[in-house]
């Protein structure tokens, strides 16, 4: 009586296992692209299951799938990223890396998107312009573009702030703002927005921007051009067919600002 259903179930399981086995073998035969990453939400972070997630992760997965590669995300000490590249620990750096900061240090692929450096304050703050930051306390992430801007005053509109507090994690600067330890925080718009919402901080951006940044993927200068060329072509295709915009929109990014003027748009 139960023989036929049992046979059907067994056959279904066998077919499923065969399909999974074939898929695993096929993936195992594909070349790997080992990607060096830095924890910088929402570009790269670990999700609730500890798996890599974020805008850069989603873009890399899509690009690698089209190229016939398997992406391997490896979180590294970002201060030692050059050593990781040179030793072969990673093939490239793909983690909201700004091309204009180190334009000649790497073989670049991109830009694949742009971002804005912004300043956030508490909703009821008297700070409304960059000049209002003069003499104030500003928190930034250690090693970030915002840190460089305030410490070196490398822009015409950068004021002389009273103190720059550098923190290792973005949530630490959000906590500093919420608790009144600093008057403002600065960083990439998507990152600042994400962490302040996550920490439930009532905030606003001041109207003036600190700067714009173009993100790219960094390879060693003597790395294989075939991989770089294939990745560059694939990212252009993703931009042209709307895939990049679709991915960024899932993270609340203003795609008109993030992708406007890039090749393929």
Regions inferred by a protein language model and the residue ranges of each:
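Extracytoplasmic small-molecule ligand-binding "clamshell" domains
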Residues: 27-97, 166, 230, 250
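C-terminal motif of bacterial Sec signal peptides marking the signal peptidase cleavage site
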Residues: 18-21
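Beta->alpha turn/N-cap motifs
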Residues: 36-41, 74-79, 88-100, 123, ...
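Bacterial signal peptide processing site
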Residues: 23-25
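A ligand-binding cleft/hinge motif common to bilobed small-molecule-binding domains
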Residues: 80-83, 95-105, 149-152, 176-212
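Flexible hinge/capping segments at coil-to-helix
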Residues: 121-138
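Periplasmic-binding protein-like
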Residues: 38-39, 114-121, 197-236, 254-265
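Ligand-binding cleft/hinge of the Venus flytrap
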Residues: 46-48, 60-69, 146-167, 196-200, ...
